[in-house]
Amino acid sequence: MARAILTKELHFEIQNETGLLGQITATLAMSGVYIIHMSAYTVKDKGYFQIITRDNAKAKSALKHLVPKAIERDVIVVEFENKVGTLAPVARLLGSNDIEVQYVYGTSGDGFKIVGVFSTTNNAKAVQIINKESGALGVDSPG
């Protein structure tokens, strides 16, 4: 079965410029902040970041000179087996329980797990449902 945990991500927007990703990640590295998950993209002249770290307070403090307004949001981190089709039952499970997925990002590699970061309309309920019911849908947890 898939495993889900509730955690916090930092979310912020900033004026986009060439080298912005390098500035953000170098600032975090120099401050000793370990990045667990990250999504970054641009729309026109704005850069948007979602970052989960081992110490969000430290990350927020380190970025204050670049990003005066970073907010923490609840998100779900879901780990499940890395094979074709394992995201579909999780998405159906959430939808069938009237939980809307606001956004998701994630990654898989050559290893045995997929990690997805979800924001939903009811994160606490989503975690409970995924942890309780995903095995019945054929979604195995890694390891």
Question: Which functions belong to the PLM regions below?
Answer:
Residues 1-143:
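A conserved regulatory-domain signal marking ACT and ACT-like small-molecule sensing domains
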